[in-house]
Amino acid sequence: TDVEYLNSGGGYLQSFDGDGFTAQAGASGAANVNQLNIEYIYMAWKANPTHGGVSAGKMAYLVVAGGGSGGWNSATWDGAGGGGGVITSYGTQSGGDSPVQPSLTLASGTYTITIGGGGTSNSGAVSVSGNNSTITGNASITCVGGGGGGDVTTSPLGTGRDGGSGGGGSNYSGNALGGSGEPSQGYQGGQGSSSNGGGGGGAGKPGLSDGTGGDGIYCSISGTATYYAGGAAGFNGTGTAGQGGGGTGKNGGESPGIALAGGSNTGGGGGASTQPGDKASNAAKSEAGGSGIVIVKEKDKANGMFNMNSHFNSNVKGQWPIADKYQIGNSGMFSS
């Protein structure tokens, strides 16, 4: 099975997952790695642990930054949040329609992983861009947080904020442009129109002027093909959120007029909202972008022993959701 469980005799982790990780019973709690000689070994962290060493060599990765939040205003139709930037060495496409990047070549040292949070939700006039996700050490990768949706504080007025993927433009002061995407990480946000805010850009496609968010990147590095870093839908449009965790826009006159947030650990953008005229609702607000994620897996065999104690410690503290066993959903570090 793909479930961690305890050895009843020694009280130590007996099986990590179905790929052949096994742990020896006894005081050491150590594990023989890659018993079945599979092609990839998955490694993941959820709650800031420090893990034992892994063998030097190639490591495939997916890095996704946090998505931007949507715009909000009492009189305009604001833009949606853009998806976070994406860089990956796995599959056929990286962010911004760039080719996949080379795998990391691990040298001896410590590598720190930081997961970017999504831009925060807001019932005021300011959208918030997402935060960067990074891998740092002897190798360095930085994905830029998604741009916030256009609002009355952006310059020129109503333009989407730049980011990994750009936020959608508002209809304030005409049809404001969407924000730009980071080269080789994501696309621009959609332009606002007379009837709606622009959709947020996604890592795989741009946002559109009808409020449709751009799709994210489709990647199966976790073992399940999933979209990441989709753009959100702009306010009041007929468009939908992009695939990859993007939130949807809301009319502030609806009850409640709260937009939908980007999905956690997807890097999706947050939806936009407004309070139009006599339909004002105190509950109306834009929503947050989704937090980012990092997924890594080591290619080929690992040599020697891999200490599983930290995995078990995370599990017993309730910090290791089974569904996320390949994912790094918070900050952490590993050594090589």
Question: Predicted regions span which residues?
Answer:
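Intrinsically disordered, compositionally biased repeat/linker segments
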Residues: 308-336
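Charged, alpha-helix-forming regions
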Residues: 1-51
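A structural detector for beta-sheet-dominated domains
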Residues: 17, 24-26, 107, 188, ...
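Low-complexity, glycine/proline-biased repetitive segments and flexible coils/loops
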Residues: 52-311, 320
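Intrinsically disordered, low-complexity regions enriched in polar/acidic and amide residues
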Residues: 3, 13, 23, 34, ...
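Alpha-helix initiation/capping motif
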Residues: 1-2, 129, 299, 324, ...
